């Protein structure tokens, strides 16, 4: 009887014993300060956006989120200056009209560390950001590009990480911007009315 009690007491002590620190084996998400957007080979030249028919490409390295693979999401952002202060979404949401956008997203959400875009898309975006019309479009302009990275979670997103900024020299041209055509949805059912 004493032997069983002693054995039970010894086993229960072993169950409650634990390592002093077991964090070394658990992966920990670390948010890096920055990551690298590779300078494209066309960055040293002036890109004529009107005559460029091939797509332009960007590539970057995945941020180091602690040494293990993470399914990060990326968005390519373009700015008319090197500031990246007010986004197009923030300016659109401002009811007073006091905020003017100085950057906008060139891409939708990406999961690869590369992106191909058309010169026309870049031209339309910088024309919209600068508010150019046919009379005041410049022969040459500087455009600044960076990549935003984040990890989507069920509660939203983690901290956002931004890449370095790459300066591109472009020769823009005028494109008449127009509002997008409305999407018509033909819905059927009692809940629609």
Each language-model region and where it sits:
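Insoluble glucan recognition modules
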Residues: 17-77, 83-193
